[in-house]
From Swiss-Prot:
It comes from Methanothermobacter thermautotrophicus (Methanobacterium thermoformicicum). Gene3D superfamilies: DNA Methylase, subunit A, domain 2, Vaccinia Virus protein VP39. The lineage of its organism: Archaea, Methanobacteriati, Methanobacteriota, Methanomada group, Methanobacteria. CDD domains: Cyt_C5_DNA_methylase. One of its GO terms (biological process) is negative regulation of gene expression via chromosomal CpG island methylation. Residues 3-328 form the SAM-dependent MTase C5-type domain. InterPro entries: C5-Methyltransferase, C5_MeTfrase, C5_meth_CS, SAM-dependent_MTases_sf. The keyword Methyltransferase applies. This is Type II methyltransferase M.MthTI. It catalyses: a 2'-deoxycytidine in DNA + S-adenosyl-L-methionine = a 5-methyl-2'-deoxycytidine in DNA + S-adenosyl-L-homocysteine + H(+). Keywords: DNA-binding, Methyltransferase, Plasmid, Restriction system, S-adenosyl-L-methionine, Transferase. The keyword DNA-binding applies. Its EC number is 2.1.1.37. It comes from the Archaea.
């Protein structure tokens, strides 16, 4: 059975890697952020289409069984500007809907931040879901936490999955796995990383483990407003797209609360406080060590890793979709 799919807002390709592991074949990828192009092409072996999604013509996209993608989430996030579809980045979601309508794949998957189903954005989110229903899809959505699917990270995201109506299928989200993966499991064997060079430039190939370097610099008052350390036997905090907000490595003690929204580093900590390295973040997101991230400034490395869908979670969703499709098409 043909398992060719198209990827949008591809980034480094965490969603793509998970779907590939489940037996799908990425034949088209699109992202207009140049910071991810080399990383995607080197690791996935296909050329990326570099246009903004609004400029894409349906004729440029091959016929595929499915569409996958996570439209930019800053416009829907609780930490961001909360302007939703009024933000140009929010409008890209509707460009995705239009392409699904034109190409009519058997299924689509979209991922976004949980802020999209917050009270502020819920009416807009329901309009978005209805726009998929109106073009002939049975749509299901759910907030999933990656830690329930073998990912060593607290990370809640909304997943929307639609099956074309003529398949008579309803997507049921996979049940959580009875398997907790900890920070120790994910990063405990890594050697000491290197700090980034001046102005957070990358060490490039002068690293024992690729991308095993961390952002230096001060910690903002926002960063110090809560504890940023999880212990070895816990899962990580959410890996964010900004290196400045990368969690601290578990070698240090948990931070101490000294007032409302004010924490300090424990002066008694046996080891220093530092941000997780790009490779540590990548491991937490499920990328193997032979998946190399290419960047000149470590900030771009953190952005690629933090924007990705955790590979293991993507794979679990993909396996369920593949099983459903095989059930009706074979």
């Amino acid at each position: 059975m043909n398992m060719d799919i198209a990827s949008f807002f591809s980034g480094a390709g965490g969603l793509d890697l998970g779907f590939t592991k489940a037996g799908f074949n990425i034949v088209f990828a699109n992202d207009n952020w140049k910071g991810c192009w080399k990383t995607f092409e080197k690791n996935h072996g296909i050329k990326i289409n570099k246009k903004p999604i609004e400029w894409l013509k349906p004729s440029e996209i091959p016929d595929v069984v499915g569409f996958i993608g996570g439209p930019p989430c800053q416009s829907w996030s609780l930490a961001g500007s909360m302007c939703g579809a009024d933000d140009p980045r929010g409008k890209t979601f509707y460009a995705y809907v239009d392409l699904v309508k034109e190409k009519d794949p058997l299924f689509f998957l979209a991922e976004n931040v949980p802020g999209i189903v917050s009270r502020t954005h819920l009416p807009e989110f329901k309009r978005l879901v209805n726009s998929f229903i109106d073009i002939g899809y049975n749509v299901e959505y759910k907030v999933l936490n990656a830690k329930d699917y073998g990912v060593p990270q607290d990370r809640k995201r909304v997943f929307i999955v639609g099956y074309r109506e003529d398949l008579n299928l309803k997507f049921e989200f996979p049940k959580p796995l009875n398997k907790k993966v900890t920070l120790r499991d994910a990063i405990g064997d890594l050697p000491e990383p290197k700090p980034a060079l001046e102005k957070n430039r990358s060490n490039g190939e002068n690293l024992e483990v690729p991308n095993h370097e961390y952002m230096t610099g001060t910690f903002s008052s926002r960063y110090m407003s809560r504890n940023r350390v999880r212990s070895w036997d816990e899962v990580s905090f959410t890996i964010q797209a900004g290196g400045r907000h990368a969690p601290c490595h578990p070698q240090a003690n948990k931070m101490i609360k000294v007032g409302p929204d004010k924490f300090i580093f424990d002066p008694e900590s046996p080891k220093p406080y530092r941000r997780l390295s790009v490779r540590e973040c990548a491991r937490i997101q499920g990328f193997p060590d032979d998946f190399i991230f290419y960047y000149k400034n470590v900030a771009d490395g953190y952005t690629m890793v933090g924007n990705a869908v955790p590979v293991k979670l993507a794979e679990e969703l993909a396996k369920k979709i593949k099983k459903d499709l095989e059930g009706v098409l074979n």
